[in-house]
Amino acid sequence: MPPSTVNQEVNSILFIKNLSFKITAEEMYDLFGRYGPVRQIRLGNTVQTRGTAFVVYENVQDARRACEKLSGYNFMDRYLVVHYYNPERAKVDGQDLAARYAALEQVKQKYGVQL
């Protein structure tokens, strides 16, 4: 079993990372639709979410097959990172992100950096 599927609760929603910023929804449907009917694809469209997407399959078996086949797949010169969506992990990641932004702001103030 690929590393991306170990210790994850299998479900019909996949979280994709390391996507090209130029990818279109049509290209996503073409790629992920090879493994079964896709109900929805949500591409990240903010600075923090660019290069990520959620792919919702009609059934779990199709999501599992896509996760196994596409994790590490080279697409548009980038290796895809595919995980099953885990809402508990998303909450933790969001908290970590807020803390990292706060720490970054402190460093920027300390050194007088303005971006």
Curated annotation (Swiss-Prot):
It comes from the Eukaryota. GO terms for cellular component: U2 snRNP. One of its GO terms (biological process) is mRNA cis splicing, via spliceosome. Its main location: nucleus. Signal peptide: none annotated. It is found in: Nucleus. Residues 12-87 form the RRM domain. Disulfide bonds: none annotated. Residues 9-22 are annotated as: Interaction with pre-mRNA branch site. PROSITE patterns: RRM. The keyword ATP-binding does not apply. One of its GO terms (molecular function) is RNA binding. Keywords: mRNA processing, mRNA splicing, Nucleus, RNA-binding. Necessary for the splicing of pre-mRNA. PANTHER family: RNA RECOGNITION MOTIF RRM DOMAIN CONTAINING PROTEIN. This is Splicing factor 3B subunit 6-like protein. It comes from Schizosaccharomyces pombe (strain 972 / ATCC 24843) (Fission yeast).
